Design a protein with these regions (language model features):
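Bacterial N-terminal signal peptides that target proteins for export
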Residues: 2-15
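Bacterial N-terminal signal peptides
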Residues: 14-24
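Zinc-dependent metalloendopeptidases
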Residues: 28-289, 309
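Right-handed parallel beta-helix/beta-solenoid
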Residues: 91, 286-314, 318, 343-355
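Short strand-loop junctions, especially beta-strand C-caps/beta-turns
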Residues: 93-97, 295-297, 330
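Hydrophobic beta-strand residues in large extracellular and virion-surface proteins
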Residues: 121, 136-138, 157, 292, ...
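N-terminal extracellular ligand-recognition/capping segment immediately after the signal peptide
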Residues: 321-356
Length: 356
């Protein structure tokens, strides 16, 4: 995705809407608006369990998260990057149970993400991916679900609500590496989980599998109530059928002050928020984008979003002519003559300055 080039043009764009959890896992999103069905063997691979309502991850990892323990061996940041799709290319195939109309619906959903990020969905020749390739197998199901990130070899993406485009987009975002917004470690600052209205309360299996925050989560940006990846206010309410969402009276999720105007808006499945778009574009950026964060450890900086440059001069010099340098924190550039023809943009709430 290319931008018009301006020399040191500053603008505020939405940074990140979503809590990103770089764990090899699977997510399955709420069926929308119908009730959630039980997990089927063909939808969830052996050795995987459901967590976060629509997240299916290796059972051993689920046990580690729910017990408050890290998995061994310890996972470091370098491994997290490997969960992104190489060069933004996502190979896929359709199961024979997916109709032509539903295939078209999925391809249209893919186009939504291709329009905002440097990602490309490529259907395998003859709709059959090599057995040793990394690819997404898209199938008709009684649930909406998707493995999270590029987990290696075949991974399933299940769709029940083909008629709702942004339910499919939601699942594709899981496949690109995203978890849910309300799984952020800072979520209790913004929303309250009403245990009395939740199926089984806050000590039950529903809470543990759907609302408990993993220790290994990584947050970027501010809390986005408008995110496509947020639960709705009635998720798993006692008013609803088991494992489902409905027009409940006793809300499970209450938005805290001063953001109560978002109460009925959370959980939308109609669009990508501005921050959703920014998030996916940063993780799958244009080839000429670089990132700068003066608070990041310099020795680790490579110019990517996850590992930005810490030195402003290094960042500017490394940005290709005509490219874009994103400033991720309140940072400054030293006073000097600059001849790099690049566009400099800032994340939301971030101020980039020249001089002290």
């Amino acid at each position: 995705m290319k931008n018009n080039t301006k020399s040191f043009t500053f603008s505020n764009l939405g940074l990140l809407a979503i809590a990103l959890f770089w764990l090899a896992a699977t997510a399955h999103a709420q069926i929308f608006p119908t009730a959630r069905a039980k997990t089927r063997a063909e939808s969830v691979p052996d050795g995987y369990s459901v967590i976060d309502g629509d997240i299916i991850m290796p059972t051993a990892k689920v046990k580690a998260i729910l017990s408050g323990q890290k998995e061994l061996p310890d996972v470091n940041d370098a491994v997290y990057i490997d969960l992104l799709w190489t060069n933004g290319i996502v190979l896929f195939e359709f199961d024979i149970n997916v109709s032509a109309a539903n295939q078209s619906a999925a391809i249209s959903a893919m186009a939504v993400l291709e329009s905002v990020a440097n990602v490309q969905f490529e259907q395998c020749p003859f709709n059959s991916c090599p057995i040793l390739a990394n690819f997404v197998h898209i199938q008709n199901s009684t649930m909406n679900s998707s493995q999270v990130g590029m987990v290696g070899l075949r991974q399933n993406l299940n769709v029940a609500n083909w008629e709702t485009q942004y339910v499919i987009v939601h699942e594709l975002l899981h496949a690109l590496g995203f978890y849910h917004e309300q799984m952020r470690s800072d979520r209790d600052t913004y929303i309250q989980i009403n245990c009395g209205n939740l199926q089984g309360g806050c000590n039950g299996d529903v809470y543990n599998a759907n609302f408990k925050v993993p220790l290994l989560s990584v947050n970027y940006g501010y809390y986005d109530f408008d995110s496509l990846m947020h639960y709705d206010e009635c998720a798993f309410s006692n008013d609803c059928a088991a494992g489902s969402t409905c027009a409940c009276t006793n809300k499970v999720i209450t938005v805290r002050p001063p953001n109560q105007n978002q109460q009925t808006l959370i959980g939308q499945r109609t669009h990508l928020s501005a921050l959703d778009r920014a998030t996916v574009s940063f993780l799958y950026p244009a080839d000429d984008w670089r990132f700068y964060d003066c608070t990041y450890p310099a020795i680790l900086g490579t110019g990517t979003f996850l590992h930005p440059y810490a030195d402003p001069i290094t960042a500017l010099v490394a940005t290709p002519p005509g490219g874009t340098l994103w400033v991720l924190k309140n940072c400054s550039f030293p006073v000097r003559v600059y001849n790099q023809q690049v566009t400099v943009k800032t994340a939301p709430g971030v101020t980039a300055r020249f001089g002290n």
